[in-house]
């Protein structure tokens, strides 16, 4: 059976948790393959809302095996906080599997992330301050601490001593902060070791064997394509690869095993943090979208920047990921608009660009070129088929589909599990 990748097609917060929840009972494994607790998934089941930051959304579906794979960076304190919270609400968390090769977020990563962002002032990137970037930096520099290192106190102490020789110099001499102690961190993480041990396996081996046995593996990305370290709006990006390519390296599954790539698109556009955003609305319409769509970060609580749908970005995501199907979310938010602007291209210094420009300088100066589609007044939150939608809502979906370069196979018309129109099977 296939592996299926789920990717955000914008700047994150597109509704990936809703998509995972929709297909959760049709798959056998749900895998987080990158990022950490710097992103949030919100899943609504009946009258219960669950906000997950690190755990795969599939942990909420009985019988599904949730996996935190090698490409994820783990803050053990956050991990056990989420596990304990779900256990208290009656969720079985014993099925969770964690890669021995996943890297750990250490106290010095969080400390450096926070002070360096403040030090940058107006040049800040907009990090969540949770240590994600410094952890990936150490991973790339071959100086990171992995889950498996917690099981050998000698190796863990040696790695901590080497790390703090460097990190404490930066904390004390550059940022005038207090030095961190090896023994205190060692004791804390050795305590985590015994709690995490029952979950730790070779996740790549488990997932590939599952595929060999005909099981379905669902690879759940966090953030979005435009936040990818290689393909995003650099440097205003995350430190990992939330694209379909990242799903392979972050899970240990080969590219030929992924047979479908589902891109999640919001019916408008949002972004958290700094960086270019051509369709951003800094007026009453931006506040209208924010209020209607409840656009506040699951992880940070920060206001999301809001704007109209950006077709060049959607086409870019299709190209970068090889998207085969789109899931369009939050269509219901647009109800009540007489006309809906859609960005179809950019004007840069008087020249039309139908695709995302090559340089960030050009992207910063891009002005959206809009086409206007007729809106609708009806409440569509009770729609249960495409034919239930008003004609203008149907036309909006078809226009977005044509502009984005891949079929829209599902539509979200509200936050609930049942508020989804599946035009063709996603799994």
UniProtKB/Swiss-Prot annotation:
Annotated GO biological process = 'de novo' AMP biosynthetic process; IMP metabolic process
Listed binding positions for Mg(2+) are 13, 40
Where along this sequence does the record place binding of GTP? 12-18, 40-42, 304, 330-332, 412-414
Instruction: State its Enzyme Commission number(s).
Output: 6.3.4.4
Q: Which cofactor does it need?
A: Mg(2+)
Q: Which pathway features in its UniProt record? A: Purine metabolism; AMP biosynthesis via de novo pathway; AMP from IMP: step 1/2
Please give the catalytic activity noted in the UniProt record.
IMP + L-aspartate + GTP = N(6)-(1,2-dicarboxyethyl)-AMP + GDP + phosphate + 2 H(+)
Compartments, record wording = Cytoplasm
GO function terms (MF aspect): adenylosuccinate synthase activity; GTP binding; magnesium ion binding
- Per UniProt, substrate binds at 298-304
Keyword Magnesium assigned to the entry: answer is yes
Name the catalytic site residues. 13 (proton acceptor), 41 (proton donor)
HAMAP family (alphabetical): Adenylosucc_synth
What family is it from? Belongs to the adenylosuccinate synthetase family.
Q: What does this protein do?
A: Plays an important role in the de novo pathway of purine nucleotide biosynthesis. Catalyzes the first committed step in the biosynthesis of AMP from IMP.
Q: How does it associate, per the subunit comment?
A: Homodimer.
Protein name (Swiss-Prot/TrEMBL): Adenylosuccinate synthetase
Native organism taxonomy? Bacteria, Bacillati, Actinomycetota, Actinomycetes, Streptosporangiales
């Amino acid at each position: 059976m296939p592996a299926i990748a789920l990717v955000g097609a914008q700047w994150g917060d597109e509704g990936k948790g809703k998509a995972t929840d929709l297909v959760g009972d049709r798959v056998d494994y749900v895998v987080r393959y990158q990022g950490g607790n710097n992103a949030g998934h919100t899943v609504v089941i009946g009258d219960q809302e669950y906000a997950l930051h690190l755990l795969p959304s599939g942990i909420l579906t009985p019988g599904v095996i949730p996996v935190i794979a090698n490409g994820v960076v783990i803050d053990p304190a956050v991990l056990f906080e989420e596990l304990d919270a779900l256990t208290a609400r009656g969720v079985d968390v014993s099925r969770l599997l964690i890669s021995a090769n996943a890297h750990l977020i250490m106290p010095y990563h969080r400390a450096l992330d926070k002070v360096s962002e403040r030090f940058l002032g107006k040049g800040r990137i907009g990090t969540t301050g949770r240590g994600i970037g410094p952890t990936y930096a150490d991973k790339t520099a071959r100086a990171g601490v992995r889950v498996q290192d917690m099981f050998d106190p000698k190796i863990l102490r040696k790695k901590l001593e080497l790390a703090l020789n460097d990190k404490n110099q930066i904390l004390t001499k550059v940022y005038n902060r207090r030095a961190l102690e090896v023994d205190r961190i060692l004791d804390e993480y050795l305590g985590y070791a015994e709690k995490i041990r029952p979950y730790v396996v070779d996740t790549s081996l488990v997932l590939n064997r599952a595929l060999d046995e005909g099981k379905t593996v669902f690879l759940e990305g966090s953030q979005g394509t435009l936040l990818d370290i290689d393909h995003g709006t650099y440097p205003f990006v995350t430190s990992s690869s939330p694209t379909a390519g990242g799903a392979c390296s972050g899970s240990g599954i080969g590219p030929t095993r992924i047979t479908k790539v589902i891109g999640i698109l919001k019916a408008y556009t949002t972004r958290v943090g700094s960086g270019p955003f051509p369709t951003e609305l800094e007026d009453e319409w931006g506040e209208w979208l924010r209020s209607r769509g409840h656009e506040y970060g699951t992880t940070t609580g920060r206001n999301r920047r809001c704007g109209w749908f950006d077709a060049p970005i959607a086409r870019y995501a299709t190209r970068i990921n090889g998207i085969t199907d789109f899931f369009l979310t939050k269509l219901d938010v647009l109800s009540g608009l007489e006309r809906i602007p859609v960005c179809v291209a950019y004007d840069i210094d008087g020249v039309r660009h139908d695709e995302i420009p090559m340089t960030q300088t050009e992207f910063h100066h891009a002005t959206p070129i809009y086409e206007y589609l007729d809106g609708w007044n009806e409440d569509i939150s009770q729609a249960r088929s495409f034919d239930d939608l008003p004609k203008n809502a149907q036309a909006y979906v078809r226009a977005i589909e044509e502009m984005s370069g891949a079929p829209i196979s599902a539509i979200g018309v509200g936050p609930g599990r049942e508020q989804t129109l599946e035009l063709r099977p996603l799994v």
